[in-house]
């Protein structure tokens, strides 16, 4: 999901009060479904430190599963980056949810009538802006478009991700919108729409409201590492659910760009659809990278998973090792 910088962006950033903050932040992740990755297109991956590529043979036909979730050919997932002109004050929405954790056997199901639950979400913000400055739904109040839901209620929501914790250690996951509470491209600067703490082996569920764009960061322990500017510098999972600017498509990817640029640890993360397909993977220490972003691939378009308009069910494995 990469979108290359424009002269407009560079001009806007140069006009800011701290141009030095560009370093390590020239590229941040947004999403744009402008190009489809068809059969015959090139897929990039880094395996054992070697950049390789192969021809995509995925036609988009999903394997048979019990869940009535639409699947599609993965398309180009655009990602772009921008630096904040000034460091915003961190904001926290519903920082820790009280929903019970556990594993649901039917969370991948969807309502028969297509009437999705919105309980727990706040109000919706109207979309504005364009390109990398596009602002979708960030919730009213900010961050209320991302909520933890109970295992038994997960199936009622349209866009849901199942988070599977580390096998060995407690981990923390922080979620944010691309657009921060100050209205700028600052969501990852210490802000939290939702914070989850997962014990070893624990599973939790998160629902995302329509037209939401943002990311989550995950790391061992009670908090996420930050770079010298206050931005989260761990492995990210990026999302764009039901994007109005992209005609309702949804997409995701794993990114180590921020961790690499800060010279911090690269945590393992794997994001796939519920059928185990359309995966974006970074294993611990970058030992394997498949359809995911590293600093070396920051300028490559067409990385990550993408599905046509409709419900989304993702499985996120934290502390992924292979």
UniProtKB/Swiss-Prot annotation:
Entry annotated with the keyword Amino-acid biosynthesis: no
Main localization category: secreted
Positions in coiled-coil regions: none
Biased composition (Low complexity): 80-105
Listed Pfam families: Allergen_Asp_f_4
GO CC, alphabetical: extracellular region
Range of residues in the leader sequence: 1-20
Keyword Secreted on entry: yes
Matches recorded under InterPro entries: Allergen_Asp_f_4
Name of the featured protein: Allergen Asp f 4
UniProt source species: Aspergillus fumigatus (strain ATCC MYA-4609 / CBS 101355 / FGSC A1100 / Af293)
């Amino acid at each position: 999901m990469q979108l290359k910088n424009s002269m407009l962006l560079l001009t806007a950033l140069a006009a800011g009060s701290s141009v030095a903050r560009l370093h390590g932040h020239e590229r941040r992740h947004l999403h744009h479904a402008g190009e489809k990755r068809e059969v015959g297109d090139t897929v990039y991956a880094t395996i054992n430190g070697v950049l390789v590529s192969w021809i995509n043979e995925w036609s988009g036909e999903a394997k048979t599963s019990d869940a009535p979730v639409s699947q599609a050919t993965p398309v180009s997932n655009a990602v772009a980056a921008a630096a904040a002109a000034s460091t915003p004050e961190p904001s926290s929405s519903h920082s820790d949810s009280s929903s019970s954790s556990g594993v649901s056997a039917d969370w991948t199901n969807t309502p028969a009538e297509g009437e999705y639950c919105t309980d727990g979400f706040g109000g919706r913000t109207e979309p504005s802006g364009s390109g990398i400055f596009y602002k979708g739904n960030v919730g009213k109040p900010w961050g209320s478009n991302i909520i933890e839901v109970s295992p038994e209620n997960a199936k009622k929501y349209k866009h849901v991700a199942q988070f599977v914790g580390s096998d060995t250690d407690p981990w923390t996951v922080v979620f944010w919108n691309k657009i921060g509470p100050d209205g700028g491209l600052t969501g990852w600067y210490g802000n939290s729409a939702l914070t989850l703490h997962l014990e070893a082996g624990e599973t939790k569920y998160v629902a995302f409201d329509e037209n939401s764009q943002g990311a989550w960061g995950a790391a061992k322990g009670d908090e996420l590492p930050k770079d010298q500017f206050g931005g989260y510098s761990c492995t990210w999972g990026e999302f764009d659910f039901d994007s109005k600017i992209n005609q309702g498509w949804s997409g995701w990817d794993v990114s180590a760009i921020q961790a690499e640029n800060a010279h911090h640890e690269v945590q393992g993360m794997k994001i796939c659809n519920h059928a185990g397909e359309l995966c974006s993977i970074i294993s611990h220490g970058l030992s394997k990278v498949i359809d995911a972003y590293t600093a070396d691939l920051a300028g490559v378009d067409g990385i990550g998973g993408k599905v046509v308009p409709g419900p989304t069910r993702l499985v996120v494995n934290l502390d992924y090792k292979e």
